[in-house]
Structures are given as structure tokens and as C-alpha cells.
């Protein structure tokens, strides 16, 4: 890992203020503790003293490839009870992780926690795989805000991860906060100081798949293009879903989305 690109909690001081956080995180508690679909199990992974993160594991097969997935800022893991079967049907095990304050997780969501917690989550996820004798290869995936923790893990553990998948990801935190209408005077120079995602992409050389909606107005397609162009991966692919926006990308592009995902995981698993 390139130490020059590593972030410390002090780096997030400008971001982790209530007047900024309220524009970014929308925590919601899980009203359904038990999964609504077969072959799904809830897990709690400790990430800090007194704080555990809720995850939901959807099993296709013990030998299938495994995706550790970070969702968007308005979602919780149990929402994927309706989507995960599409992943398992193409032969992929999916583990969806929450953030602090989301689902059944403890704590309060912050930028610092969002970037720190993926490391113990990754260790906990690997423990789940070992304990259950799930032998497939490991991938990381992030949607929207979740692109940041996914890229953090891909950047940090390339020798353990077979591939990175980004859906509707953002290139830099400054541009993201602009799009979320965070008042500029509350951020100072943070736009230049913390680029979050794009700064790590040249150092990530594992296979990378980027999926983005053509008409995404929340995180415009240019973010996906920038991440793709900045990637240091020898194998990389940008899939643009025609006619799709931020929140209907899976529905509109389901066939192309799942086909690309299956091809990517199979080809690099």
C-alpha cells in the first residue's frame, strides 16, 4: 500500500461535522432482523470497541466466488433481499455490509468510520468464509457512496482480492459533496485535500469493472469515466447502461449488468 495515499482520521475533520454529514448519510434501522429469502444469513462483525456492523450473506454455492458489497447512502443490507437472488442465480455469493448506524449496526456514521471500518469488516468476512468452508475467490464491490470503502480495500489488499467492481461510483469527494448540495463555505479546501477515490485508482492493478448509468444525474457518468481512465488495472472495463439513472440502473440494465458481472467474476475467479 502506498503510504502517501493513506488517510488518517485527522484528514476527515472537515468532513465529519454535523452540518456536512447530514447531507451525506441517511441511516435507517432494519425492521426485519430475519432475511426474507432462502440461503441468507445475518451476521454482526465487530469493527471497534462496542461497535459491530450488520451484514447479510446470500449463498449461491460453497464453491462460488464471493463479493463483499458496500451499498449506497440511502440503503441498508436487508434491502438486498429483493436483489441478491439475481446475484446468486448467476453463481455469486453476495455479502452486503452496512455502515455504522445503518441496519442493525451500532455507532454513528462518519467519513472516518466509513474508511476505517472496511478493514475489520474484510477480516470478519474472510473469517465467515473460512468457518463455513466457502472456497471461492474474493471480490469487492461498492455502489455509489459504497465505492469509497470498496476502493479502499482494493487499494489495501490487492494480493487477496481478485477484482474490484464499482457501480455508480464517485471520482472525488469534493465533486460528490457539490452534487449533494453541501454549501461550499462549510468545506474550505477539503475538495483539493481529499480526493478519496480517483487518487487511488492508478495504484489499483487488479481487474476492475465499472458500471454506470448513462443519465445518472446524482453521480454523473463522467465520474465513472474518470475512474476508468484513472485505473491502473491491466484488465478494466467500463459498462455504460443506456437510459439508466442512479437508482434504476439495475432495473433498466439488468441483463447487461448481470452478464458483465458474471463474465467478470468467472473470468477472474
Language model features with spans:
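An N-terminal hydrophobic leader/cap segment in hydrolases
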Residues: 1-46, 54
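Conserved alpha/beta-hydrolase
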Residues: 87-106
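Alpha/beta-hydrolase active-site loop
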Residues: 109-131
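Alpha/beta-hydrolase fold nucleophile elbow
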Residues: 131-144
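Hydrolase active-site cap/lid region
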Residues: 149-206
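Short beta-strand/loop motif that positions the catalytic acidic residue
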Residues: 204-205, 210-212, 216
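Acidic catalytic loop of the alpha/beta-hydrolase fold
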Residues: 215-219, 246-248
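Catalytic histidine-centered segment of alpha/beta-hydrolase-like enzymes
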Residues: 244-255
